[in-house]
UniProtKB/Swiss-Prot annotation:
Subcellular location: Secreted
Similarity-based family: Belongs to the venom Kunitz-type family.
Signal peptide: none
Modification sites for Pyrrolidone carboxylic acid: Q1
Keywords from the named record: Disulfide bond, Ion channel impairing toxin, Neurotoxin, Potassium channel impairing toxin, Pyrrolidone carboxylic acid, Secreted, Toxin, Voltage-gated potassium channel impairing toxin
GO molecular function: potassium channel regulator activity; serine-type endopeptidase inhibitor activity; toxin activity
Organism the protein comes from: Dendroaspis angusticeps
This protein's name: Kunitz-type serine protease inhibitor homolog alpha-dendrotoxin
Disulfide bridge partners, by residue number: C7-C57, C16-C40, C32-C53
Alphabetical list of InterPro entries matching this protein: Kunitz_BPTI, Kunitz_BPTI_sf, Prtase_inh_Kunz-CS, TFPI/VKTCI-like
Short name of any one Pfam family annotated for the protein: Kunitz_BPTI
Keyword match Disulfide bond: yes
Site (Important for binding to potassium channels): L9
Main location: secreted
Length: 59
């Protein structure tokens, strides 16, 4: 079980057109993974670095 509720949210790239490197916690694989964020929208399961993702969702 992830440490925080935001970590169970599905990856959501948002609704704009940029491709900004970001990371999210993949609950099925129990690890943080890279994805492209569009620059707007999405949800809180989005981190600037893999370290921040791991610190928040894994511990």
């Amino acid at each position: 079980q992830p440490r925080r509720k935001l970590c169970i949210l599905h990856r959501n790239p948002g609704r704009c057109y940029d491709k900004i490197p970001a990371f999210y916690y993949n609950q099925k694989k129990k690890q943080c993974e890279r994805f492209d964020w569009s620059g707007c929208g999405g949800n809180s399961n989005r981190f600037k670095t893999i370290e921040e993702c791991r610190r928040t969702c894994i511990g």
